[in-house]
């Protein structure tokens, strides 16, 4: 072995969506950072669907952008169709989703990283980690390189002991056509005793664009004006916008699957890993929803200069000959040719309960994990974890501090709290329904929630900060102006817009805007106010803050109650067996989950209010009642 590199501050293992965010933010925080990946050309690659965002996921992308991350900007510059989902519903569940030119996206990510100061790229496979006295010291590569570092972040995605299944064929791979990382998985499990389990995910076959009969299909176009992920104004020329197309499976499709279900690795026992509940294979859909006559399929373009179509909704691991039959049984795809077969992939993942909320390991100091290795599914969940791990790795080096958002601050807070407190037995996907504070942590206010924090952490550059600061001031001043603008009505005007006003015949502009049917622009049309803001995003923000003020205050009161328990620390060295009055079940669960606060302990199934009271009394009695 040879050691020909000077000591690096932070090493990131893996160049996917978690690894790229971790590398970018760590380098931005002036740490000497190295990203090691098996193939530099596939950095930032979209392994499965050519899209970013969606319900819950779009919220994460907005939060990443608000904190100075790179996914949002890259998506805005490579998007070929943008839509706002749930646009007719309330602001809490509205979400941005974009179809992405996958080649353009990865090239943009690579360009951002190549231009980032303090960041070095290395094409190698990491096969071991160096540890002394439970502290990380570096990594070992397959070429025999020893690279010393103060911190290591592992972001291996599905590559950790990955195995691909197509029918009865199986082969070791981290992604189709790429090597799996077997030795690193063995080291983590056998040498360092991490709890390692198996998960499974899948992808549909790709279809030759030229072989699709689009005249038989329903078109779906993007929104105008085009929504975006980044809070920075888009500058430049957008890529050409393309439609998606909709088709459906049918009785013939379902019969092919049912008649050949024994050839599915999911149903013949070949696959042991648990797959994503909210992104099931077409085999699962047909079996589990047997009374359903059809399933919707979205035919999504893979890019402007790409000849392939991604059929979203028919992930499968059936043999290739059956995949062809299934595809050709569908309207518009009767003559379709498959360019790449669909497959399922099993891979190892780490039990996230072995991690702190910073995503640092509880077992080895200075070792972080982020992305699918922690049991999540999706680019957005991975990228959010990468950002958090990179921030905390840099903070640890600088002054030993740390940062993570609470559940009431961000969907990222919900994500890490769910994972690190409760763990997961299936690929974890973010939804707005996972948050009990979704009216507070909306897509539209991600910058108002997080950009100031990012500035304090040193990851928000001046142009973004100035943009945010101006926006925040405009919103604050305009809401104040609306509250102070009193309007006098005569009887005719009052009846015209059906207003209930007080006896004096006056009402503020803010009170009028509270009404659900009144918009900010209505105030101008009725000559209630003379000024006019031009920025539609600022106008929307003002409307939301005023119209939902009562509901928001109610949620804030609930948050304050929960914060008390979240702030009471449970010391690492606490021995729950010594706390008299706790049942064996409670002690067992506390030792398994290892909560770091009373707030975390409360969320564990089986931990009773009585048990929490006993622990609180014990902490007070032993002078261990510390707040964060």
Swiss-Prot record:
> Could you cite one Gene Ontology molecular function of this protein?
flavin adenine dinucleotide binding
Q: Which cofactor does it need?
A: FAD
- Protease among keywords: no
Compartments it resides in: Cytoplasm
Tell me, in one coarse class, where this protein mainly resides: cytoplasm
State the InterPro entries in the record: FAD/NAD-bd_sf, GIDA_C_N, MnmG, MnmG-rel, MnmG-rel_CS, MnmG_C, MnmG_C_subdom, MnmG_C_subdom_sf
The record's listing under SMART domains reads: GIDA_assoc_3
Alphabetized, the UniProt keywords read: Cytoplasm, FAD, Flavoprotein, NAD, tRNA processing
Question: What would be one Gene Ontology cellular-component term for the protein?
Answer: cytosol
Explain the purpose of this protein. NAD-binding protein involved in the addition of a carboxymethylaminomethyl (cmnm) group at the wobble position (U34) of certain tRNAs, forming tRNA-cmnm(5)s(2)U34.
Q: Which family does it belong to?
A: Belongs to the MnmG family.
| UniProt protein name | tRNA uridine 5-carboxymethylaminomethyl modification enzyme MnmG
Q: Which organism is it from?
A: Wigglesworthia glossinidia brevipalpis
Q: Which gene encodes it?
A: mnmG
């Amino acid at each position: 072995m040879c050691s020909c590199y000077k000591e690096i501050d932070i090493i990131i293992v893996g160049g996917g969506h978690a690894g790229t965010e971790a590398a970018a933010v760590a380098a931005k925080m002036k740490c000497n950072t190295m990203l090691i990946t098996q193939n530099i050309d596939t950095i930032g690659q979209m392994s499965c669907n050519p899209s970013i965002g969606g319900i819950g996921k779009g919220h994460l992308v907005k939060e990443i952008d608000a904190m100075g991350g790179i996914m949002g900007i890259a998506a805005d510059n490579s998007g070929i169709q943008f839509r706002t989902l749930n646009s007719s519903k309330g602001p809490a569940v509205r979400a941005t989703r974009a179809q992405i030119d996958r080649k353009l996206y990865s090239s943009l990510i690579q360009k951002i990283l190549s231009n980032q100061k303090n960041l070095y790229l290395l094409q190698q496979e990491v096969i071991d980690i160096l540890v002394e006295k439970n502290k990380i010291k570096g990594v070992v590569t397959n070429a025999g390189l020893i690279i010393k570092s103060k911190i290591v972040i592992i972001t291996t995605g599905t590559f950790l002991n990955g195995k691909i299944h197509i029918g009865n064929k199986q082969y070791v791979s981290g992604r189709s056509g790429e090597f799996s990382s077997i030795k690193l998985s063995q080291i983590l499990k056998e040498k360092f005793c991490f709890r390692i389990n198996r998960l499974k995910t899948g992808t549909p076959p790709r279809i030759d664009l030229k072989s699709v009969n689009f005249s038989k299909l329903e078109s779906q176009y993007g929104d105008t004006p085009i929504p975006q992920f980044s809070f920075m104004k888009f500058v430049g020329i957008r890529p050409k916008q393309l439609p998606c197309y909709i088709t459906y499976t049918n009785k013939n499709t379902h019969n092919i699957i049912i008649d050949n279900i024994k050839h599915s690795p999911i149903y013949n026992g070949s696959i042991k890993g648990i797959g994503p509940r909210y992104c099931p294979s077409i085999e699962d859909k047909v079996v589990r929803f047997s009374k359903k006559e059809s399933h919707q399929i979205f035919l999504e373009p893979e890019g402007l200069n790409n000849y392939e179509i991604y059929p979203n909704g028919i992930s499968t691991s059936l043999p290739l000959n059956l995949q062809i039959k299934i595809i050709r049984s569908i309207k518009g795809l009767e003559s379709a040719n498959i360019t790449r077969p669909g497959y399922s992939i099993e891979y190892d993942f780490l039990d996230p309960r072995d991690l702190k909320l910073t995503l640092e390991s509880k077992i080895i100091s200075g070792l972080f994990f982020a992305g699918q290795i922690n049991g999540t599914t999706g680019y957005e969940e991975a990228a959010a974890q990468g950002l958090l791990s990179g921030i905390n790795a840099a903070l640890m080096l600088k002054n030993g501090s740390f940062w993570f958002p609470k559940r009431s601050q961000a969907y990222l807070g919900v994500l890490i709290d769910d994972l690190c407190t409760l763990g997961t037995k299936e690929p974890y996907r973010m939804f707005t329904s996972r948050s009990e504070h979704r009216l507070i942590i909306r897509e539209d206010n991600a910058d108002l929630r997080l950009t100031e924090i990012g500035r304090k952490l040193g990851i928000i550059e001046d142009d973004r900060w100035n943009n945010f600061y101006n926006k925040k001031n405009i919103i604050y001043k305009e809401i104040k102006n609306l509250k102070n603008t009193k309007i006098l009505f005569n009887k005719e005007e009052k009846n015209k817009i059906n207003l209930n006003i007080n006896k004096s015949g006056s009402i503020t502009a803010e009170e009028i805007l509270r009404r659900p049917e009144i918009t900010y622009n209505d105030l101008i049309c009725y000559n209630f106010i003379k000024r006019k803001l031009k920025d539609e995003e600022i106008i929307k923000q003002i409307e939301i803050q005023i119209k939902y003020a009562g509901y928001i205050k109610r949620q804030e009161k609930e948050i304050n109650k929960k914060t008390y328990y979240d702030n009471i620390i449970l010391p690492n060295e606490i021995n729950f067996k010594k706390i008299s009055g706790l049942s064996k079940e409670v002690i067992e669960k506390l030792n398994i989950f290892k909560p770091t606060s009373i707030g975390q302990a409360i969320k564990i199934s089986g931990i009773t209010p009585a048990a929490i009271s006993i622990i609180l009394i014990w902490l007070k009695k032993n002078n261990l009642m510390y707040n964060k």
